[in-house]
């Protein structure tokens, strides 16, 4: 994206009605420039109601991405794109993500990369950089762990957990 396109995107985002979210969290007002970061983490929130019964919905076009969490350096962002209220403009968010992910010099970190990459590809986003998957790496570090989910790993290795109150209020 050019700087003019980013400026227009910022204005579009500022014009969005965020809705009433009972939380300290609010969606970002701008899309960050992550060009200076070598490693970027991405986690998708999806609505995939038939996942347990039929497998990932991305291959059947059954379900959709509802939000995109991105972290780089000490910063993190969440971009709601298909919640009930408070969404950011979908097209510019996915255009930004497409531009970001086509950078072959970057490393992208996922948890359960196969699942998230399937959803990204279904949205037309191809990740061209190196891919690292914490779900694959975790048992290599400790094969005797009881749980390998992202929340357990983040708690044990980073001392942080999901903010359930914030997640519930953002999802409403």
Residue ranges and their predicted role:
Residues 53-55, 105:
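Sparse, context-dependent recognition of short Cys/His-centered cofactor- or disulfide-binding micro-motifs
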